[in-house]
């Protein structure tokens, strides 16, 4: 076991905080100092000094040039798949719930997702699971 304790480790810890200036434009500097109290007999103490400076942020542009219009936001694409809560029938033949009806829990709007439609059923399958993901062409809305 190590013979040092947290008290001796904390005895060589010093934090120097910068003086608070009234001006916001002055850069701030912080200093953190660690020293080891193990080798008090030698003059070559191992130590770690960390300095961090925070520069003032450049002022934001407040005025726009004349004739320059703000960029128009792109219109959202229409949502894909059935809406949440819609009753759907499963068309995947290998599914436990084939031709069964369940309700849509969520639809992933990413077009690269293979099975974006999450459907929840009232009955559970052999693994005690009541939800499954399906592709858009594997479900049809029930009216």
Swiss-Prot record:
Keywords: Chloroplast, Membrane, Photosynthesis, Photosystem I, Plastid, Thylakoid, Transit peptide. Gene3D superfamilies: 2.30.30.50. It is a peripheral membrane protein. Residues 56-75 have a biased composition (Low complexity). GO terms for biological process: photosynthesis. It is found in: Plastid, Chloroplast thylakoid membrane. Its main location: plastid. GO terms for cellular component: chloroplast thylakoid membrane; photosystem I reaction center. Coiled coil: none annotated. 2 isoforms exists (ratio 1:1). With or without the N-terminal alanine. Residues 56-86 are annotated as: Disordered. The keyword Plastid applies. Residues 1-51 form a transit peptide. Belongs to the PsaE family. Stabilizes the interaction between PsaC and the PSI core, assists the docking of the ferredoxin to PSI and interacts with ferredoxin-NADP oxidoreductase. This is Photosystem I reaction center subunit IV B, chloroplastic. It comes from Nicotiana sylvestris. The gene is PSAEB.
